[in-house]
Amino acid sequence: MNMKEQIHTLSEEMIANLGRLVAIDSQLGTPEEGKPFGAGPAKALEEGLKIAEELGFKTVNLDHYCGYAEMGEGEEIVGIAGHLDIVPVGGDWTYDPFKLTREGDHVYGRGTTDDKGPVLEALYAMKLLRDSGVKLNKRVRLIMGCNEETGSKCMEHYNEVAEELSCGFTPDANFPCIHGEKGHMSMTAYSKNTQIISMNGGFVSNAVCDTCTTVIPTETGLKEKLEASLAETKLQQYRVTEENGQITIFAKGVPAHASMPELGVNAAGVTFECMEKAGFEDDFVKFYNEHIGMSCDGAGVGLKFEDEYGALTLCNGIVKTEDGIISCTIDIRVPVTLKAADVRTMCEARLEDENGRIEIGEIGDPLFFPRESPLVNALYKAYVDVTGDTEHEPMVIGGGTYAKSLKNIIAFGPEKMGMDYHIHSADEFILVSEMEEAVLIYMEAIKNLLAI
């Protein structure tokens, strides 16, 4: 039986174990003693380590921040870092997000692709490599994190208490290979004076705001003008109702990850735009449309920039109203040739006027490995050797992964280019056939990394 056939025979077992992980709601929760990210992530980590133990690996739980499964001997460590925490469910799911549902090659559930499925792909790659009798001149360590989606504090803890990795990868992006990740910058826009009674939408800051409900005072003819304006947009659904002197606007856009906001439709942005087109005079509506708007390039805040590896992107993820003030979270992905200080300087003059203000939050520098570095070459070779695909080259992405938190690793798979796995959206899925192929690719990758 060749290796591909061996992987196929283990496929049902791997999917069953994925079901065990998907069944756990591992969103960030309220910290408890010994559970820094809440009960859900801690339970997912315990289950992930239990699966690894059942497969014969030594495991270590690092205070429920993260843990790892390990094989081999030696001082050097080939590391693989995935995460078991998930983003909020949100959206209109066809399937139960916490019950693995299989339809043909598709397996649905929150975390199937981001990132519980890839963690198991790496784990089974380790198992098959170990069982094949390959000499392990280094340790191979699969780290399971619990806080990737909300700050990667799990990897901060790993760096404090565990050994540095010699090289490795994180299975939390795309094939064929990621040799750079854009920097990250967060902003929040606030209203000063507004007639908007309430405006709320979005679930997470790192995804396009795909639903929004807005309440404004009624004006003669405004409802009809809003409906006419909304009818010309790319919204999936909209609804305008008028009652008791108020107009309520519901808008449903299209979700997308903040690293590729151009693939989505911002429900809040459409609402702001349509309010202005309909003649609703409001200071913050003007501010939003001028500084944020429907463009994803950051031009409104003076940040339009593009290098050979990609353009700066801007995404409005959440809109909410508290104490009469509207706030809009903004997620910006910064090209790899820009530094955080450069970005701050570029936008300083565009952060406030009489209609609103924008505060700069967290800023993180980009990550970049030269295309011909040994690490990039080793991983890319594994991908090409298994798939035969030489058309797609290593790339730079807008997403951020554990590669920015751990030394000497880059993101590597398992998503295929051009595929939409509904990550951070409803009906997230993974393909069983792609899981099997990823196991084979990760086996080859580990072997290549053992040799450098």
Regions found by a protein language model. Name each.
Residues 48, 119-129, 158, 271-275, ...:
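Buried hydrophobic packing segments
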Residues 87-102, 184-185, 189-191, 241-253, ...:
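Acidic-glycine-rich active-site phosphate/pyrophosphate-binding loop
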Residues 2-110, 134-136, 251:
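Acidic/His- and Gly-rich active-site-bordering loop/insert found
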Residues 149, 155-335:
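Midchain, well-structured core segments that form catalytic/ion-binding scaffolds
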Residues 54, 77-144, 150, 161-163, ...:
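Active-site metal-coordination/substrate-binding segment of hydrolases
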Residues 252-323, 329, 333-345, 357-452:
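An extended, acidic, His-containing surface patch that forms the Zn2+-binding/catalytic region
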Residues 85, 230-237, 278, 349-355, ...:
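A common structural junction motif
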